[in-house]
Amino acid sequence: MIGNRRQVEYPVAVVGRGDTLTAQLLRRLTGCSVEELTPCQAAMGGAAHYRAVVVENFETHDPRTLSPCAAARWALSARTDVTVAAVDDEEGRRFAASSPAVFSYSDGLPQADLAAEHVRLKDNTLVFDALTRDDLIRVRVALGDRPRLYDHLAALAGALAIGMPLEQAAARLALI
C-alpha cells in the first residue's frame, strides 16, 4: 500500500496471433496476469503499463515494410518496464540496439540476454542449454519440437525479465 492507494501489480503482455503458447507458458511459469494482444491492438495503444511485453516473432520477409511485430514493439516500448524480443532477425537486433530496456533472447546468439544452445529433440523431449550472462542450465521440455522452441524461449525470457531466477524458471518449465 502506498499512502492510501493500493499498489497495482501491472500485468505482462504477449503480442502474438491470439491464444498463444507463449502466453500460456508464461502464465504457468510466473503466476502473473498475462494480457494477449494482437499487433494491431498493441500498435493502437492504450493507457496500460506493463511489467514486461513479450513480442513473438512472425516477421514479414518484405524489407520495404515495417512488420506488425515491429510496429507492436515500438508502440509498446514506451509503456513497459522491459520489452522481451528475439534477436535472431535483423529487425529484432535493430530494435534491441536502439532501445534501452530490452531483454533479448536467441536460438544460438550468445550475446543475447538468454540464448539456447545445443538444442535437440531426444525421446520426445526438447532439450537445450539456457545461457545467460550469469548462468547456464539444461532445460528439458516434454513433447517439444523445433517451432515450439521459440515459444518456450520467449516464455523463459519473459520470466527472467520480470526477475525470476533461471534455475527456478527452468524447473517450472520442465513441469508444464
Region spans (language model):
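N-terminal basic/disordered segments at the start of proteins
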Residues: 40-42
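Acidic, Mg2+-coordinating active-site environments of NTP-dependent enzymes
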Residues: 2-34, 45-176
